[in-house]
Amino acid sequence: MENINPSKDVLLHLVNLLQNKKYNEAIAQTKKLLITFKRSFYLYNFLGLVYANRSNFEKAITYYKKSIELNNVYPDVYNNLGLTYSLLGNIKLAKSNFEKAISLNINFTLAYTNLAKLFYLEMDYSRSFICLHKSLLINPNYLESMILFKNLLCLDLIFHKNDTFFYSVIINLITKFNIVQPRKISLSVANLLKKDPSINKLLNLNDINKTDPLRTLKILNQNILLIEFIKICPLSDNDFENLLKSIRKQIIFFNFGVSEYNEVKNFIIALSEQCFLNEYVYDVSLEEKNKISEIEKKIINNIYKDKANIGIDLTKLSLYKNLSNSILLSKIDKNIFNDFIKKIQLEFLLEKNLKKEIPKLSITKNPTSNLVKKQYEENPYPRWSKPAFTIEPLSVENFFRKIDVKLPKLNYKLFESPEILIAGCGTGQHSLNTSTTFKDSNVTAIDLSLNSLAYAKRKCLEFKINNINFIQSDLLNLELLNKKFDIIESVGVIHHMKDPLDGLKILVKILNDGGLIELGLYSELGRRNILKFRKDHMQNKKNYSIENLKFNRKIIKDSDNSDIKTIIKYNDFHTLSEFRDMIFHVQEHNFNIPRIIELLDHVGLTFCGFSNLSKHILKKADINSDGFNKFSLSNWGKIEKDYPDIFSGMYQFWCQK
């Protein structure tokens, strides 16, 4: 029987040429092979792929159609044709070809994912989710599917049923893939967990304290998604906060036998990790405080017949206190510590040593800077566990072509190995993301807080990031670096300075001509409910104690005012340092569009576009209508008045010098 396609080795050689972008060679060799293999549908499909990679889409379509003439049941060519039509903007033909590919191969993961992407781009999220579900059922480890899945989760996806299949997919996403900050999918995860009938029942109980604690803990110990998620991320949901707080109280008062504890310890230790991550933000009753003191005395005096009970009591304490530097640990055999306590103790010691290695640019003399520094030394911001890395670093050119900004002047050759400054890096989450976003980049990250920098440095070691140089410095002293940068990112920073203009002037001075700067500034309209709370309801405004922070959280939780109640929906409400940063910051400015225009004009920066407005948000505000110039900052004032929540996080945008 005649072979219509070349041998496997020959085909692999052609694929290798394509992967190495040797397009001319690939075309020449394929056309030569077609002299012998005239009816090779594979070779015609391959030629289409090569031309598509060269952006010659018309030729690509011609060769794909020739392949179909030779074999109209070859699913790959329909998928490739669909991709080409989607690049040309012909969504109708793209969909029909993906659907044809699926009809020929019902297990075609890539075609399902490509179809899901089209629905996602059209903001038809329910259909996108259906296609993606099918793709993930076939291959739950397919990266493209996981990226789209996390994008859908970031939209606060509402699950309509208790589909436990997604438990394993989300666990896979947050444990094996570093492509999403878990905090961004927290609401979607909470929504899915609420569909579990047993958890839903617990959430709706009038008084959980009347239930059998051990039975409740066994129910929670069986939910692997709940356990895995609360180990790595604060669960930003008020219903779950109330539930977990009540269960914590049950745990500290329950007299566990060793075997009983072992049955439910996975959940209890996970709850300890949750409390550590949210910085023990839950209220503590007087009776709980008394019980904590009782357990501490018991440990100090070593009143135990069985060593296992020491470990149980230590775990109970870790639900209420950060034990990483506790004197109690010196009283106990280290073999008794659970893995979580061992981990936070090691992390504390590592950060202590890292502080000695972080260079200091200068002594901070500015009074406001010192107040801000004190806040972040007390409450390093934010505490996080998992980063969101870019899968494949991009050149500066490709990055700015990918995001929706308009750059008036840019010589990309000057940015081949970009020098990047993160001005106000905090605990490093943003810095790590940036360091993996830009190809061949060198990142300098500065912050006032040494505790925050040590946290950031530890995270770099954990995730093997080696292109970031951390320095302790006041932004006002950055000229002492004697260095200029191609890109500066300063998100959520200069609005915490006494005069934001002074800070921006410094940043512009050390930015190269034609360089780019990303700024993030609070919106007075977007944060109107926070400002209203401060003005009308906040108690003891200059008292930054844990007790007062919790007292004011309770005012918000118990408020009958619907505007004030919306503050609970902020992620920042659900951890102590973030709540302090949001409500009790020692220095804060809130902006509006006219004030930003004035600020940028003063330093000669050109507005290039917002970086934190997804198509989902733009659709809500009907921004994509014809005639609206989104690159004119003055146009956004009216938009924000009509849609006051559009910048509820902050204004985040790129400018050019």
Task: Identify the residue ranges that each predicted region occupies.
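Conserved alpha-helical positions within TPR/SEL1-like repeat arrays
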Residues: 15, 42-53, 76-87, 110-117, ...
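N-terminal accessory segments
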Residues: 130, 137, 141-371, 415, ...
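Residue-level recognition of tetratricopeptide repeat
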Residues: 40, 74, 108, 141-142, ...
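Rossmann-like AdoMet/SAM-dependent catalytic core
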Residues: 552, 558-657
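Conserved class I S-adenosyl-L-methionine
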Residues: 516-565
